Amino acid sequence: MSDDEAFDIAGSLALKDEDDYSDSSSNEGEDFQDEIIPSDDEKEPSPPPKKKSKPNPQAFPSLELSDNEGNNDDDDDDDSKINSYFINNNPTAKKAKAGSFASFGLTKFILANIAKKGYKQPTPIQRKTIPLIMEGRDVVGMARTGSGKTAAFVLPLIERLKSRQPGGVRAVILSPSRELALQTYKQVKEFSHGTNLQSIVLIGGDSLEEDFSKMMTKPDIIVCTPGRFLHLKVEMQYDLMTVQYIVFDEADRLFEMGFAEQLNELLASLPSNRQSLLFSATLPRSLVDFAKAGLTNPVLVRLDAESKISDQLQMAYFTTKKNEREANLLYILQEVIKMPLGSEEQIKKLKDMDKRKIDSDSEDDDDDEERKKGKKRYKFKKERLPPANRLPSPHSTIVFVPTKHHVEYVTKLLRDAGYLVSYIYGTLDQHARKNQLYQFRVGLTNVLVVTDVAARGIDIPVLANVINFTLPASSKIFIHRVGRTARAGNKGWAYSIVNEKELPYLLDLELFLGKKILLTSMHEAKVEMLKKSSTGTFIPPVVNYTERLVLGSVPRVDLETFQELYENLLRNNYEIKVLKDVAAKGEKLYHRTRQPASQESLKRSKEIIESSWDDQHLLFGENLEKQKDAFLAKLQDRNSKQTVFELKGSDESLVEFMNRRRRQLAPIQRKAKERKELLAKERLAGLTHGIEDEILRADGENGYGVDEDELQEAFEDADKKKSFRDPQFFLSHYAPASVIQDQQLSLSTSFANEAQAATFDLDNDDKIQTNKQVMRWDKKKGKYINSKSTDKKYIISENGTKIPASFRSGKFDEWRKQRNLKPTSTVEDDSNKRFKHKQQRAPKLPDKFRDDYHKQKKKVEKAIESGVNVKGFHTPQQEIKSTEQIRKARLLKEKRKAKNARPSKKRK
């Protein structure tokens, strides 16, 4: 497409009234099923005055911002910058409204694909990043999950590449998970419809030979996971110097999953003039360091920095005892969410769905093959996915568990309880993963049990509820979990089950979010104070589940009923019991490897446990057992308290021992009580100041693990320091808030990592280390061997880093030799896209008794003339010998001469 056509977009579009369209969608690449209905007032560009023209169904919808958007001064400034940029570079862009897709200077076919997707207006992250990306700048984009980040980098990518060019890969998109890679690949295919751009997806779990074939076609765009892409790059020794555009999608997740070495290795093999984009929901310090090293003068674009979770999200936290977590889960599903049980018809339909193939590509291939064979193929009724802004089912719920063993255990438990359940974990087969996800999205199942691999990347636009079976150790993981609900302006609930060991992590979450914990006793005390101070009719305050972390327990009577149900299921099903034991072992390892909570939260958790933290939750209204509890409290506060040793009074020595013990503990208890009362008074007076006070009183604290000054110094538009204190040298008397928040955003806090970071080794200048040989006895070899010789083998890459030797196993060389292909090269012309075999085989020998005797005879004669060895026929000698033949003949002649040219006996 020529440049003139690209510039003449705005003039060729029939724009509609901006009042006919709603606000912009916040989904980043989901399929919208909404119809684009043309307005009745819309007319053709030059209608005749006599007749009233019909609305044009092919007209492009209005893409400008609504009146409600763009009221902020920052948005107006950004829109003016965008408009001025495109007016200077595109004369026809003056007709397009500022902030619309048309004003970005996108070509006509891209705008048409946007219309097919149902997008009407760009989201804020798209309005701010697309102009910068099209300028060629390196961008670091920060926005919440579901804000449209995928389209923000896919649209400029297609605009820049435009059409197919032979020579090598030009764009690489790195995703942390297989699901996110497939979802991004789907968006790339949809937005590039109408072009000849070739794109492929490379994910783990697929055949290496298939990936070899894909890479040999030298596509324009590669959507991949880092592990598989680096494996193919090292195995094939693939040249990436043609890459112009690289995207790190969900970059913080890439670092969490341990892809830092792969990313650094890939960066070293890319050209220096590439354009790099980094999109993330949060920005920990390790990611800032990576951006400094891998990006050139990057521009930081931040949205929603002040809020970490949606303001439409309501949260409830339920306390549990050691063996009552499953009963709490069953109670939440049955009584709180009102989850319906599955009928026999639904279960039968679910079993039939397991038989069908969800992968559309494989279905198309099977259809073509069976159509060629003339076979009839039974076709299932195709279920249509709901629109992206509609719930899969009214009770759609995701249950997050810590390990894959918990996934199997909880899935089996809920299915035996009668619920329709799907499940996904990291090592699940790719086809089974698609099948389970499809069943949930269609609405055949209401519950999806997953590990943290589904916190991102799984294509579920809107959810009703999220349940945390266990509270995660990192507050950042919690944010990504609950980010699956309350999206696009919809309300949602997040329920979390918390025990005593997880309470410190809840306090860390309180500090991280800046939202205080609300106990039932605290709320009742507040109500009593307001009731005493009110003069007229008293209206109790409404509990705000959005701004407070409301903590409490499930009603005890109902919980005991569900506990009996759980024990009955456990007693009657041996498989659930086995899965529970396996999950318990996995949970021990999980607790051993998770990062510890902060010391401040550990201290505060003891105080909260003592202050009736497990009272009935405010969500369930008035406590019916309150009178019984009050009676028990009266018994506890009686004057004469006797222990079991003093009841009968038979042994006077025990009675004397208990009295002496009371006298010893009395002053300690009195001092502890006075200290508690003093701390409570000081807190009310505002005299104390600690980490929690700094967090809860701070204004504009973003909580992303990196200070504002550090972000401004690392990226563009750095401001001057506003304080006389230099943060590099100033030492406070208490640990600052960033310490807690950095711990929540850190990847690992193990001693090995901290010790490695603190190591100061002067001998490691050029990676030469003195390896200390540790010998051990090998039973098989019967001798002492070096213990390091049994470790995993590595190879040194071009960047100097160690890569597993399995990455270069020679599989590609074998695959290439079998097909007689040349090594990969970026300068070859691959316009024909076919590989012609050059193998020559001897033809069949002619048979006199067959009709094709003369034909085969001619083939044999032709093969002999061309030098092919045919059995029973002598190949004609070549008239001109090659240099190798001359050399061999000369050597043979010298050998014969040395052997035979001896003096004869007659001369003696």
UniProtKB/Swiss-Prot annotation:
Pfam families in the cross-refs: DBP10CT, DEAD, Helicase_C
Catalysed reactions listed for this entry: ATP + H2O = ADP + phosphate + H(+)
Function text: ATP-binding RNA helicase involved in the biogenesis of 60S ribosomal subunits and is required for the normal formation of 25S and 5.8S rRNAs.
PROSITE patterns according to UniProt: DEAD_ATP_HELICASE, HELICASE_ATP_BIND_1, HELICASE_CTER, Q_MOTIF
Cellular localization per UniProt: Nucleus, Nucleolus
Acidic residues: bias regions: 17-43, 66-79
Binding site for ATP: A143, R144, T145, G146, S147, G148, K149, T150
Region span, Disordered: 1-84, 352-389, 821-885
Transmembrane segment boundaries: none
Motif Q motif: chain residues: 99-127
Root EC class: hydrolase
The protein's name in its UniProt record: ATP-dependent RNA helicase DBP10
Annotated ranges, domain Helicase ATP-binding: 130-301
The enzyme's E.C. designation: 3.6.4.13
UniProt comment concerning the protein's domains: The Q motif is unique to and characteristic of the DEAD box family of RNA helicases and controls ATP binding and hydrolysis.
Record's keyword annotation contains rRNA processing: yes
Molecular function terms, GO-annotated: ATP binding; ATP hydrolysis activity; identical protein binding; RNA binding; RNA helicase activity
Protein family according to the UniProt entry: Belongs to the DEAD box helicase family. DDX54/DBP10 subfamily.
Gene (UniProt): DBP10
